[in-house]
Amino acid sequence: ITDDGPSFSRAVVEEVLEPSADRVQAPCPFIGICGGCPWGGLSHESQLAAKEENLRSALTRIGKFSPEEVAELMRPIRHTKEPWGYRNKVELAPVREGGKFRLGMHGRDASQVIKVDSCPLFDKKHAKAIKAVTGALGFLGNSRDLELERVGIRSSRRTGALEIALWTPTGAFPRAQVSRVLSDAVRATSVVRVMSKGEKRARRVAGVEALAGEGSWTEKIGEENMRLSAPSFFQVNTKAAEILIEALDPQPDEFGIDLYCGAGTFTLPLARRCDFVSAVESYGPAVRDLRRNLDIANLTNVDVIGGDAVREFPDEDADVL
């Protein structure tokens, strides 16, 4: 027990003496060590039940809702059929050990970086990209300091797009060499460098430069074709995002508000179905992507509000929020 509170406790598993019927053999040796999928040791059905119970507990403990109110608020979980291979994005962390540079994934201990060649959560279409990218950048990183802060890989099984995003400080960078080595290692549609500056805990994007290819990542959600720059957030499970939109069931005469809307993951599908949508987002790169995606989709029934959702919350009643 690491934290024994009045209404709940936290604990860390040290050893499994007798596995429950809910446990399964996960397709990854790093389950329980890697920070990316702490639920991987449970069957899909058990994961859904546990997450449903977590939500019920939070509504009761934190929200102070009665059991009757919780029963009224909650609906059965809608989920995708695939428990693995659904993520369209992974992030790799750089580390230098014993003079050697390598990339890996953060462990549950944030200071730990685990060497991986693949991830069963990542899109199967580009499953080999992780090993190819880690190998290529590992080769480069041992010959010179690339000053990498992190590496993002985005994949779309729908459009075939694969983007490699290298996050670095501003300043000199071996653009041509990195572009050439990565292009030889993996067939990416886009390789970009995201430059950041500022204090470590409050770094901000100073610019994005295309090193090879299109300079952006494309994904299809519903009938919408979206183009995103590397700094912009997009739901990591595209199919699950579509399920959420279907659950909302927006109608042609309804008004929608999309808070923290990002580049328009939900804004565009809502605008396609609703009468009008107000979209609020404070992050500059995402706002620019949102405006571009609305132009591409020829959607004019959206009011884009650049600012913090708490301060810029539209003073109107919404049918869909």
Question: Predicted segment positions?
Answer:
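SAM-dependent transferase fold signal centered on methyltransferase-like domains
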Residues: 1-209, 221, 225, 242-245, ...
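Rossmann-like S-adenosyl-L-methionine
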Residues: 173-321
